[in-house]
Regions:
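Loop-to-transmembrane alpha-helix initiation sites
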Residues: 115-133
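Alpha-helical transmembrane segments in multipass membrane proteins, preferentially the mid-helix core
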Residues: 72-86, 108, 138
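Membrane-interface capping segments at transmembrane-helix boundaries
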Residues: 27-28, 139-149
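A generic, lipid-embedded transmembrane alpha helix
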Residues: 19-20, 39-55
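Loop-to-helix transition at the N-terminal end of transmembrane alpha-helices
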Residues: 1-19, 32-41
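Structural signature of hydrophobic alpha-helical transmembrane segments
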Residues: 3-15, 60-72, 125-129
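Hydrophobic alpha-helical transmembrane segments in multi-pass integral membrane proteins
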Residues: 49-57, 104-118
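Cytoplasmic-side transmembrane-helix entry/capping segments in multi-pass membrane proteins
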Residues: 31-44, 63-69, 89-99
Length: 149
């Protein structure tokens, strides 16, 4: 894959925003579970955005089905604002994102999307499982924070 200057600028901006946000998280006086949940969800979201945009999770990066991931991230961001970043709401929201991540992968495989990949369907199922596990882990951190208060 050949990267353009724009690709490098987007990647640099993504990393600066990610590390800046994580830095801000750890100077706040939230519980360590809440901070861990935020950091894990930010890293997962940034990684999903990067992978889906750069190489694509379903087929290649140009495959239209990959647009489900930015849509999912947008809903996650809107949902975070709606629940006002409360641990209880974030736990449910990230649980939903974990389920949505798996659902997107399963629907893609059942619909036969991305068959041009040499490792189809294992690549879609494995990445869906890994990202789902990351979302659910972040949600678990928020759930534990909510239950221990």
């Amino acid at each position: 894959m050949d990267w353009s200057v724009f690709d490098f600028l987007v990647a640099a901006l993504l990393l600066v925003l990610l590390f800046g946000a994580i830095g801000l998280i750890f100077v706040r006086r939230w519980s360590w579970l809440y901070r861990l949940g935020l950091a894990l969800s930010l890293v997962t979201g940034a990684l999903l955005f990067w992978v889906a945009g750069a190489v694509g999770l379903i087929g290649g990066a140009a495959h239209d089905a990959n647009m489900a991931y930015p849509a999912m991230l947008t809903l996650g961001l809107i949902g975070s604002v709606v629940v006002r970043f409360k641990a209880s709401g974030l736990a449910l929201l990230l649980g939903g994102l974990g389920i949505a991540q798996l659902a997107i992968g399963l629907i893609a495989v059942l619909a036969g999307l991305g068959q041009d990949s040499q490792r189809w369907p294992d690549d879609i199922l494995a990445t869906s499982f890994i990202f789902s596990l990351l979302w659910l882990s972040a949600g678990f951190c928020f759930w534990r924070d909510w239950k221990t208060r």
